[in-house]
């Protein structure tokens, strides 16, 4: 069985453009001796669409995931969690196709394996890793035709007990096998799951490299697998606010990329990978405390490049990004970000064209 992550490469012209921009930006940082910046003049981009608000009041919307329909990109899907009630499925314009009350679903992630969509979520109601498998053929119509019961017990699925209070989750395919990282609420543990064997194969401590660790506020939530480069990037919250990178094969720390002493304002939250080709591109991080989004080089040593804001978006938790071309709608892919306020309505997710981000960096 072929287990290959869904990867859409950007065109050569875009690759050359982005590579040139990356070189110029890094050169600029070196030339001007840029380190931590208090400059508030970050470029601001507008969003091109937004999802309908979630049903729950207050802090509820949290984490998105994107599935790209390679046969018809207009019929791609955005999954979004209401961490107090369940999972939404939206079209690319933010319209609700399906919503199901599944409990306190905090984070969600997915991969495509053969012709199936594998979706994982962190269920805080039951302290379980919930693992759903959907056939990709006709999946858009499936969610459209099942507006309130798409996550059916008749589907192939698993509810895996974590044995701890859980928080965030991310999924990857490492050495051909589906895996997941599951983080602990108000704790320092990250579980590494083998999703073929449906079991935990390692647990590591996100504070193991630190001295004088505070007693509270050390949990991680946001994380992302870089399947091709075999990394896990984890955003560690609390007073120190680290973005850390681990080896996805042995879960050993590779590097502390950034912190509150650098370019992170408040808690680092959602983290995502924008792929230019199989191994190059960008890491994007939600710097929640100052409502900006940091850009880093995807390759080691993960150099900080710059930051930007999204118009009228603040206090962002989860994010997801894809480089897949969505035609005239978003030729260089989209970034989906949770909006922590969205006043006067309940929280929702904003959809940003990555073309606008790159234009602002010119």
How would you name each of these model-derived features?
Residues 1-18:
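N-terminal secretory signal peptides that target proteins for export/translocation
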Residues 20-27:
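Sec-dependent signal peptide recognition
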Residues 13, 27-28:
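Enrichment for repetitive, rod-forming helical segments
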